[in-house]
Amino acid sequence: MSELSVATGAVSTASSSIPMPAGVNPADLAAELAAVVTESVDEDYLLYECDGQWVLAAGVQAMVELDSDELRVIRDGVTRRQQWSGRPGAALGEAVDRLLLETDQAFGWVAFEFGVHRYGLQQRLAPHTPLARVFSPRTRIMVSEKEIRLFDAGIRHREAIDRLLATGVREVPQSRSVDVSDDPSGFRRRVAVAVDEIAAGRYHKVILSRCVEVPFAIDFPLTYRLGRRHNTPVRSFLLQLGGIRALGYSPELVTAVRADGVVITEPLAGTRALGRGPAIDRLARDDLESNSKEIVEHAISVRSSLEEITDIAEPGSAAVIDFMTVRERGSVQHLGSTIRARLDPSSDRMAALEALFPAVTASGIPKAAGVEAIFRLDECPRGLYSGAVVMLSADGGLDAALTLRAAYQVGGRTWLRAGAGIIEESEPEREFEETCEKLSTLTPYLVARQ
């Protein structure tokens, strides 16, 4: 098991295996299965890439919906509602643990707003604000370079796989792009306000973001396939769940909790463009590794993450095991670090998630002041953006990927979103340019829905 793996526990459901034919791309096959098996019947699903394996969780057996003012558990068409108070992680964790009494894995997403309760900002949320959606699937299909494994799969799932292996996946048509150069939300102006507030001592860092509207409907599975070929994410995902469609190439882990109690977080902060040719990329990397603004931004993010993980760790177990190395993520390169600890016996995976959520690299420092500034200066609510896509296992494991470099669709609206970390040395024009670089993870690879 790799350092960042989350064990899935022993399989207790009916399973079968199909050898993976040579030359078949597992990401392509998994995304096409999502299109054929789930989207064709308008069924909720989540596809999650983790450590060389794509897990397609198809169909909802039971769903946990956590809102700011209510918890709902939906099973067999029956919805049970209850009010909750205190920590959202405790409320969500208890409900998810019940799901995991009957299955090995659960999947879902956690909104940015899930993290505001820890900082006393829950009164800033509108009624019925979605905080999390987690479900146990009817069927799981795990795709890797070696094999395809099916759990509780029906005839139509097996037939879909046989058909795709026999005929091949669809060709990806020509992509379309969108213009990211406009600034209708006044991002540069908002950055300037944040710089003034930082200079006045209100906080040290804040991540501000901007949305880019996509003026056409996109084919999410095809876009995922095309974009995945050009990205090197730590995790990736494709989903239709809880009223939202999304796909993304996550650059970092918010939290990974292993069954043996090891906790990992991987803050990335500090950015330069990538993919402009070897010589230009080398110059950008050298600048990234020597630029005082980027180094300061990264160092204070690592310090904050280390303090947060210490809150839920066994005393003396928290350590930075990899500091400020360059991580390549598609169209950009980042300074990244890895922090590891051992979960204290008095804590659990939800306590670990809450301690590190929202990610310091998507909120601010100090985090309470940064989140408060986001409520005032950013386009809110953020929802899934800068939240997490999660996979949980019955053995206590958790894998939570930061939701960035993603496309979203709710109703008839499709959009992208990207942000930048603002510190006192920030320049509005450079921060705007950084959002353009991050948006380039997706903008060349948008496939219109036919």
UniProtKB/Swiss-Prot annotation:
Protein name: Salicylate synthase
Quaternary organization: Monomer.
Gene name of the encoded protein: mbtI
The organism of origin for this protein: Mycobacterium tuberculosis (strain ATCC 25618 / H37Rv)
Molecular-function GO terms, alphabetical: chorismate mutase activity; isochorismate pyruvate lyase activity; isochorismate synthase activity; magnesium ion binding; oxo-acid-lyase activity
Binding positions (substrate): 270-271, 385, 405, 419-421, 438
Effect of residue 334 to M: Only the chorismate mutase activity is observed
Site (Could activate a water molecule for attack at the C2 of chorismate and involved in recognition/elimination of the C4 hydroxyl): 268
Pathway where it operates: Siderophore biosynthesis; mycobactin biosynthesis
